[in-house]
Each structure stands twice: as C-alpha cells, then as structure tokens.
C-alpha cells in the first residue's frame, strides 16, 4: 500500500540554492560557477519574500550563509534539504533525466557561439532556403522573431537559433513557410544532430503569425526530441499501471517516454499552475504521479540576468501555493525542487552549476525537519518506493524520513 496515493513534483526551473562542489568545472563567460547562488543572490540583491515556502522550511536548508530575507522556522510545516547533481551537465534535460533516476555521463552539446557552418549548410541544401546568420546564437524566442521576422517575411530565409539548452530551434512565419514544410525541415535537422559533435536534445519547430511589431507564436510548435537512453522511474510507473501526468514541457523533455497523460504546454508559470490545479481536480486522478515544470524563472529572468524579475516570479509562485495546497488530498505529497541554477546576478547568460532545494509538504505530516542531503535522483527513488516500483540507475529514497 502506498504511503501517499498521489505525489506531485513541481520543478521551479533554474531555482538553485548555491554552488555545487564541482562548480569549478562549469563556466559562464569564462568565469567558474563557484560563486553562483541563485536564491541567495536574489535574496541579497533584490529582496525575497516567499512566506509559504518559508513555512515549509526553505530558510532551514543548510547553507554557508543563510538566505538574507528568508528566516528559519522553528516549527516548519514540511521537510527540506538540498540535492547535488551527479551528471556531467547543467542543462534542463540532464537535470530532469537525473531527477528521474539516470546518470548522464556524456552531456548533450550546447552551442553558445551558434551552430557550425556545416550544420547550417546541410539545412540550407535540404530545404532550399537560406538561413539568417545573424540569428544563429542563443536567443529569446520572442525577441528573435521580433528582430528577424520582418526580414523572413521579405526573403523567406529560415530563422535558426539556440538557447542555453542543447536545442536547435527554427522559427517560421506560417504565411511564408507553411507549417508542414517547417516540420519536414526540422525532421531533417533532427536526423543530422544525433551524435557528436552535435548531439542535441531537441529540435523545435517554432511557427508564428502576425505582422512586424505584433508577432505571436502559435500552438503549432513541435518538438523532435530523443528519448532517455534507458528507462526512468516514469517508465517503471507507467509499466506498473500507475498514471503519470505531465504539465508544461515535461512531455517534451522525456519525448513522451513514461508519460501516460500529457496535460499540455504552459503559456506562462501562472497558466502552468492553473493546469496543475486542474490536474489535481481530475476525478479519475485518484492515484499516481504528476510532474510539472515552470520555466519562466529560467527563460524570462535567469538568462536575461534580471534579479528583480526573477524575485517577482518567485513571489507569484509562492502566492499561489495555498491554491495548490487547497486542491491536494490529505494523503497527497507535494515535492518542490529545481533542475539546475541560473543566477541572475552572475557573469554570462548560461545556467549555473548549483545544488537544488527540495521542499516536501503533505497535510498528513505529523513531523517536520531536515531530510539527509543527497542527490537529484533521490526524488525518483522516493517516488519509486512509494508506488512499489524499481528505481532507475541511481538514487536513494528518503520516504522513511517523511512522517
């Protein structure tokens, strides 16, 4: 019998809690990640008030320097710790795959200076369309169409760009490059990025519509991902008949592997929380696992090095936690964590190699305190033990500590 009938895992994308022990091996603009501290530096420079997460025990997590504006709780409502990454990477897919029990020893490739000419030329030859070279770099998806959409409407050139993650994205105006044509180009791009030196996690078709100054991305986005190299705990749950619900980009990250119910992409964090709440309310969801990613922290504020915006985004999530609590059952477990860091005060614009926080809450708890410090995969090991399935490659369960 499961200790918790439902477990809900929410990933606050990039909300790290201090440099990892191996941060000296990871860099931003030539600066090692050793002084990175996403939550700490936001708290220090922008001020941070997250009373609902603080009540669970966020301020009680062991740190060299306490979070400046988040106090410790003498009697928290939950259990907390911080977790270290084992895998050799600090991207979204690596973080999520490890959370679900895998150890990634060969990270995906990222292209901070844009894709090499060899890849661009192959795409041009296949598609019969030129590529706008100025867009070939890490770019905000909305900014890149604002900057190059007018040119694409005139010339029919492709907008090919990347991000901090191992992805190749192609944006195309639906009136200029039909969606089906864009899909075929992306399928080809997927076929040439399956091994080093260009092993990419995802190829993303990014259709949009509108006029210059008023472009809008459409719902015709399509991801061409790779599945995890072996079964994760998601697969083990699904194989055992335990329903799994994906909210946000979780389905894309795992290429649908082990997902029994995809609840769709998020338009924003707020929309993602709405979808999570709707998922919690589903009458058929009496037992199982929900997995939510909220990406605005990372995409809108971490990469853009905007600590005030990041702070406000954290405030927004914290303000909505009571709604999530209100839609949980007494025997539900909520786990709040992250997948990597992205310190908005740090050098460069890339992710940062950090510990991630873990907050555990259930209305059924009679105790509280600290969970032993462990690793990302401990989350999936805990989920696995709760539902009586095998773990994946790595991870130690902390289920017995939740009382």
From Swiss-Prot:
GO molecular function, one term: manganese ion binding
Cofactor names: Mn(2+)
Class of enzymatic activity (EC top level): isomerase
Residue sites binding Mn(2+) 2 per the record: 298, 303, 351
Positions that bind Mn(2+) 1: 13, 339-340
E.C. no: 5.4.2.7
Gene Ontology biological process: 2-deoxyribose 1-phosphate catabolic process; 5-phosphoribose 1-diphosphate biosynthetic process; metabolic compound salvage; nucleotide metabolic process
GO cellular component terms given for this protein: cytosol
Protein name, per record: Phosphopentomutase
């Amino acid at each position: 019998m499961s200790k918790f009938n439902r477990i809900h895992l929410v990933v606050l994308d990039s909300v790290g809690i201090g440099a990892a022990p191996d941060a000296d091996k990871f860099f931003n603009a030539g600066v090692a990640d050793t002084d990175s501290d996403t939550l700490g530096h936001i708290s220090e420079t922008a001020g941070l008030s997250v009373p609902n997460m603080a009540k669970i025990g966020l301020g009680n997590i062991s740190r060299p320097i306490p979070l400046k504006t988040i106090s410790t709780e003498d009697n928290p409502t939950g259990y907390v710790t911080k977790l270290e990454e084992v895998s050799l990477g600090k991207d979204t897919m690596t973080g999520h795959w490890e959370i679900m029990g895998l150890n990634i020893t060969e990270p995906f490739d990222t292209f901070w200076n844009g894709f090499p000419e060899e890849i661009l030329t192959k795409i041009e030859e296949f598609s019969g369309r030129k590529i706008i070279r100025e867009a070939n770099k890490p770019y905000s998806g909305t900014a890149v169409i604002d900057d190059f959409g007018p040119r694409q409407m005139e010339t029919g050139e492709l907008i090919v760009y990347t991000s901090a993650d191992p992805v190749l994205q192609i944006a195309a105006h639906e009136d200029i490059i039909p969606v089906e044509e864009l899909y075929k180009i992306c399928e080809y791009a997927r076929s040439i990025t399956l091994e080093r030196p260009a092993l990419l996690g995802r190829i993303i078709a990014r259709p949009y519509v509108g006029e210059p100054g008023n472009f809008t991305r459409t719902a015709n986005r399509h991801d061409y991902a790779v599945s995890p190299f072996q079964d994760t705990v998601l697969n083990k749950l699904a194989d055992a008949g335990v329903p799994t619900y994906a909210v946000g980009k979780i389905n894309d990250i795992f290429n649908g592997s082990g997902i029994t119910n995809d609840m769709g992409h998020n338009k924003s964090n707020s929309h993602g929380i709405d979808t999570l709440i709707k998922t919690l309310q589903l009458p058929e969801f009496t037992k199982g696992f929900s997995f939510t990613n909220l990406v605005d922290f990372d995409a809108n504020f971490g990469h853009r090095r905007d600590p005030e915006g990041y702070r406000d985004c954290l405030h927004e999530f914290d303000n909505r936690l009571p709604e999530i609590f209100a839609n949980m059952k007494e025997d539900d477990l909520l786990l709040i964590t992250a997948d990597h860091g992205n310190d908005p005060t740090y050098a460069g614009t890339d992710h940062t190699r950090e510990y991630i926080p873990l907050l555990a809450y259930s209305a059924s708890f009679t105790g509280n305190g600290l969970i032993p410090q462990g690793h990302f995969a401990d989350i999936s090991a805990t989920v696995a033990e709760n539902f009586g399935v095998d773990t994946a490659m790595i991870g130690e369960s902390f289920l017995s500590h939740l009382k």
